[in-house]
Amino acid sequence: DHKELLVFSPDRKDTLHRYYLSNEVREGFIQTPVKRLASLSSVYAAYIEALGLEEYLVAVDEKDYIYSESIRKEMERRDMPELGSVEKINHEALLMAQADLIYSFGWQGNTTGIEQKYPNITFAYAYEYLEEQPLGRAEWIRFFACFFDKEAEADSIFESIKTNYENLKELTVDVAFRP
């Protein structure tokens, strides 16, 4: 019927955000799967691409920082607008994008305050940059997947990354010099 998504701080001491997701239209819930997505960080391109969500992307922060070839092709094909940085948002582009959800980031556990400027737009805040371990950052794919009902796919991708990481880590066990 619905899902509750909790976003914890990396030390798991604090709940930073709580999202309620539902496949039905319900007050106070984010309807999933999301149909129109915008991103205020080019870092999220890796998660978007890995989950195959390019077709849902309707706006990005700054095109010059997107390295993903598949996303760049979608940007050109659809003449996707640039939103700019969180500090200097192109308000017209943000409103014209008509995104159902905007991926953004919070600073040190707090939001950027952008949701107060746009109370009718739904923001989902990621804190992957606070992770100190590579697998912690990789695991954020599960967060991005929840809004598209792609949790099983995200779990599979993460487990593959985890296995590869652990195999590579095992190869370096006997390495004496570690820069």
Predicted regions and their residues:
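Generic preference for hydrophobic/aromatic residues in regular secondary structure cores
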Residues: D1-L5, Y19-L21, L57, N120-T122, ...
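Extreme N-terminal leader/targeting regions
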Residues: D1-R18, T111-Y118
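A short, structured surface patch at a secondary-structure boundary
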Residues: S9-N23, E27-Q108
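Extracytoplasmic substrate-binding proteins
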Residues: R36, E92, M96-F105, G109-P179
